Amino acid sequence: MKNILMTIKDCDTATITSPIVEKTLELASYRSSRVHIIHVAPPPRDPPYNIDSKMLRREIASELRHEHNCLQNLSKCMQDMNINATALLVRGSIINMVLHESERLAVDLIIIGRHRHGPLYSALMDGTDKGILAKSSCPIMFVPV
């Protein structure tokens, strides 16, 4: 396992002490693996007719800068712990982008944080994890968060 892709759903809650980060650090240090931290931002869309498009673009740019900084800080913390880590902020469909980047980077393992929810929530809202699981060509590890 030389290449690990760790997915981050929420940049604001991803810290060096997050369960998904701790598990990734454990695996990466044990195997001397490279870690690719990925966060997929939503694809660009047309603004509603009643919203100023310049204001919306500024707001989106500010949010993307914030997410990028969070990912870079997490990557830096991992590097300070002697883990070869890089951060990726991409835009698009979560399933497609995670699969695309996993193939492009030739990862050996995808690590995904998994929230504990009831069966109703899982039936209605959990398509991302199932989509990646169904289409991935490499192993996937789910970490409870």
Please name every model-derived segment.
Residues 1, 107-108, 138:
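Local beta-strand N-terminus motif with an aromatic residue
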Residues 55-69:
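A short acidic, glycine-rich active-site loop
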Residues 135-145:
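Short, flexible loop segments at boundaries between secondary-structure elements
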